[in-house]
Amino acid sequence: RNCEQAFDASTHNTERPRAGRGVPSVDMDDDRTDTRSPEEKRAAHTDSHPGLADRLGPMALYCTQEAGTERAFTGSLLDEKRDGAYRCAACGEALFDSDDKYDSGSGWPSFTTPSGAAAVDVRTDSSLGMVRTETTCASCGAHLGHVFPDGPGAAGERYCINSACLVFDERPDD
């Protein structure tokens, strides 16, 4: 199965509020702040969702759980132009919005900002002989991609995200 078929709303974590459009931000000093590493979050999420490997499929499992990267220009969401939200393939948490997606020419879906300040976590990634900033799902720790300081706009950030790590939900017409 592909990532678009992977999200199961019955396993979606709705207990922890997330920041985003129309959702109040979480106070980072609040005692609900999750201080676990992405690896600890991934392990806990995988342990509590034993069907995750079957649900995600090989590429999404490799990218989200092993910090893998799909080949450039091969992702199913690279050319997605519809209005909607991009969710974590592993847990269903809202991560990015189509309003913030743009064509960076990199070969991966690119966004100027996450859907909310608490949607993603970032940390230094010094693997593969280079220093980058890794982006993970703040809710479950799934690897998403990397953020680079060469994006458009005032913040100048480019969130370069694997399609396999995302599920797209089209926004209904009003």
Residue ranges of model-derived segments:
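A short Gly-Trp-Pro
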Residues: 36-174
